């Protein structure tokens, strides 16, 4: 269930006693894993995005270093270039880092400008926008010219152009996977989705997925 109780009532031991449910609300035999347990399963297999995790950077690093999976971990954030650099230098190994650029907002525009001015090329940028503006188009163009990649999150409309743009997952589910072509036409090469089967089937259809 997605319902959350008071933290005073839901203890770690209580969470460990619960069983996960399917999308149809049927209980399974599986329980909630800790981050350490989940990463142990993922070791040497996949890249793991620790979503909303930058504020827990040191805690995450302690776990990943113990397991030897640090270089498999992707973490994203909105901190300044200098802050991120100083944080990474504290450790022998580094997680992959990706800036999140809210390009419709002054703070996001400022962060993007830092990367451009310092000529820093991250592995990719997650670009978020609520409405189409000249800043959005220029941002996408500059990223590709720099030689980096564009990551677009299609989970919600507010992350990829708003309702009118029609680029988000539920819109694609209701109107057809061709919706994702609009995302690809921006130069996007990484799409974060809650509809992987729908997206992958479309990518295979157009020859963009092996």
Protein language model regions, located:
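Short, small-residue-biased leader/transition segments that mark boundaries at the very start
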Residues: 1-6
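A structural motif corresponding to the C-terminal end of an alpha-helix
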Residues: 37-48, 182-189
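Extracytoplasmic/secreted proteins, especially bacterial periplasmic and envelope-associated proteins
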Residues: 10, 14, 33-37, 55, ...
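Long, acidic (Asp/Glu-rich), low-complexity accessory segments flanking structured domains
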Residues: 10-13, 18-30
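Structured helix-beta-strand junction loops
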Residues: 10, 18, 44-45, 70, ...
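Catalytic beta/alpha-barrel core
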Residues: 27-30, 47-55, 68-135, 148
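C-terminal active-site rim and adjoining tail of enzyme catalytic domains
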Residues: 25-28, 106-210
